[in-house]
Regions:
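Juxtamembrane and boundary regions of transmembrane helices in multi-pass small-molecule transporters
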Residues: 2-3, 20, 30-34, 38-67, ...
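Short, amphipathic, aromatic/basic-enriched membrane-interface segments that mark the entry/exit
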Residues: 44-50, 66-76, 168-176, 217-221, ...
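Helical membrane-embedded segments and adjacent short helical loop/helix-boundary regions
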Residues: 47-57, 74-79, 92-101, 131-149, ...
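Lipid-exposed faces of alpha-helical membrane segments in multi-pass integral membrane proteins
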Residues: 52, 56-63, 81-88, 103, ...
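Structural signature of hydrophobic alpha-helical transmembrane segments
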Residues: 53, 71-81, 138-150, 200-204, ...
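Flexible hinge motifs at transmembrane-helix junctions and intramembrane kinks/re-entrant loops
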Residues: 70-75, 85-103, 286-293, 316-321, ...
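Transmembrane alpha-helix interface/packing and boundary motifs in multi-pass membrane proteins
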Residues: 88-96, 186-196, 232-243, 335-338, ...
């Protein structure tokens, strides 16, 4: 019987992507030295820019605190100041996201300690201030994210997601058109079982690069660009389709539960979002075939390479079989939430993780999980929820919504017009964010406040959900999403190639949002 994976010899190999990276060709020592000097200069410039942004964030914080804001008490002003600080930190990446998250929590706690409680007229105090700053850490959504990260780590520990990807590509064959469809299909299948966009991209990208290399083409070939961008964009598309596919969805669900008093089951999300993702997947195929013309329409030896890699993996291990059983059972429980049973997605996922960590019947031990789970993501997630709740509870989100959207008379517009304008704003502001989780933390509270002013069904639930779908748009630039950057790091495509596919995908995605809002989502009562 196969033993559970431990941290001693069966670690997933994070260098799989690096195996396909090739150094830039040089024609002489002089050019190589010049390139190195240029890279150092660019690095220094970025460092200076981050330093400026770091101090600018604190300057913005102080400025918002000092400027009188009519209609907002001082705690609301602190919330607004923290939002300004967070946005500058997140957009500039002056410090890493986890570091900025810790700073946000600490600053909220310190400022509230000395701030006056608008209800009592006394200082809020250290205990209550810290409780408000840490409120996001007690959200059930944080527990779900932690469990989802553990599930993604288990997939990497066993290599099950890679085996699944290889099986799909084996059936895709050697025609490029079929492999493109296969890359999309892999992203769809993995979205159901791997709750991490980066992990899904990390499973597929090395395999596709290996197929290109087997044909004798370099990493920077058009064929590489076609396949890698297809897989990456498909990951972003299905971040929308599946509730558990991306952390930013769980941010939105957490705010909806806490502030709107409504729960969104896994099945409900699928019913609402899957039609958009299915239509976008079809559009993705045609956009990619139009945007990038590969050097060849057939990869000779591609199937043999996939079969060889499957043979090297050997038969399914006991850990893989157990993880398959756990993942299928988990999916079944997710899909039947509030239909066959009342158990929440978070509870089910935590139980599944407990089973995965149990000796003999599990698939990994705690030491392995501790070393490989991205705990920074969890801290960013919880801090983002704390900030969002702070904005909503103090009325700062409502004030910001009124000032941002009230001036254009959004509340008096037809719902389709409101969705069109806010979605466009959402897409444009995403250009400044590399993390959709941070973007959701900043915008969803504002959208919840805005939804309360609109004449829409379900108290504006559908409006907020649709804006969360748009937050998942990461099609335009490599820096728009972590999975994009992972793929971009292989050197398989340029920013220009990515943008060439991203512009039509963003336009189509936006138009589909409006089409479904006017038809399908209206028919089922979402909007």
């Amino acid at each position: 019987m196969s033993t559970a994976v431990s941290g001693n010899g069966n670690d997933p190999k994070p260098t799989a992507l690096q195996d396909h990276q090739q150094p830039a060709p040089t024609t002489g020592t002089g050019k190589s030295t010049a390139a190195g000097a240029g890279a150092d200069a660019a690095k220094n410039e970025r460092g200076k820019g981050k330093t400026v942004a770091f101090f600018l964030a604190f300057a913005a914080l102080i400025a918002v605190l000092l400027i009188p804001i009519p209609g907002l008490d001082y705690t609301g002003q602190i919330a607004l100041a923290m939002l300004a600080f967070a946005v500058i930190m997140w957009v500039s990446e002056a410090v890493s996201y986890p570091v900025s998250a810790v700073m946000i929590v600490g600053l909220i706690a310190i400022m509230l300690t000395f701030a006056e409680d608008p209800d009592t007229g006394k200082a809020i105090g250290a205990s209550k201030g810290l409780s408000i700053a840490m409120s996001g850490f007690s959200s059930s959504a944080v527990a779900l994210v932690a469990a989802a990260l553990a599930l993604a780590t288990a997939m990497q520990a066993t290599g099950l997601h890679r085996r699944l990807a290889l099986y799909v590509l084996k059936f895709a064959g050697e025609k490029v058109s079929h492999i493109v469809i296969g890359a999309i299909a892999i992203s769809i299948i993995l979205a159901f079982f791997v709750p991490s966009a980066t992990a899904r991209a990390g499973a597929v990208v090395p395999i596709l690069l290996g197929m290109v290399a087997a044909f004798g083409l370099p990493t920077e070939s058009r064929l590489s660009a076609l396949l890698i961008i297809t897989a990456t964009q498909a990951v972003s598309i299905w971040n929308v389709g599946i509730k558990t596919a991306a952390a930013q969805n769980l941010v939105a669900v957490g705010f909806i539960e806490d502030q709107m008093g409504k729960s969104v089951s896994w099945g409900q999300w699928l019913l609402w979002a899957a039609p958009w993702s299915i239509l976008m997947s079809i559009a993705l195929y045609f956009v990619m075939r139009w945007a990038i013309k590969p050097e060849t329409e057939s990869i000779t030896g591609g199937r043999e390479l996939v079969e060889k890699q499957l043979a090297e993996m050997g038969p399914m291990t006991g850990a893989e079989k157990r993880l398959t059983a756990i993942a299928v059972a988990l999916l079944a429980f997710w899909a039947t939430e509030d239909i066959l049973h009342p158990i929440s997605s978070a509870t089910i996922t935590i139980v599944a993780v407990a089973i995965m960590l149990t000796p003999k019947i599990g698939v990994m031990d705690w030491k392995y999980a501790q070393e490989h789970i991205n705990w920074g993501t969890l801290i960013v997630f919880a801090a983002g929820i704390s900030l969002g709740k702070f904005l909503l509870d103090t009325g700062a989100a409502t004030w910001l919504s009124e000032k941002t959207f009230g001036a254009i008379g959004l509340s008096s517009m037809p719902i389709i017009a409101a969705i069109a304008l806010v979605s466009l704003f959402n897409i444009l502001i995403h250009l400044g964010f590399a993390s959709a989780t941070s973007l959701a933390s900043a915008l969803i509270p504002v959208f919840i406040a805005l939804a309360s002013t609109l004449d829409v069904p379900n108290g504006g639930l559908g409006f907020v959900i649709i804006q969360q779908f748009v937050i998942c748009f990461g099609f335009l630039l490599p820096v728009s999403a972590p999975q994009n950057m992972l793929a971009y790091g292989t050197g398989a495509f340029t920013s220009k190639q990515f943008l060439r596919t991203g512009i039509p995908l963003t336009i189509i995605g936006y138009l589909l949002i409006l089409l479904l809002a006017a038809t399908y989502w209206h028919w089922i009562g979402l909007v």
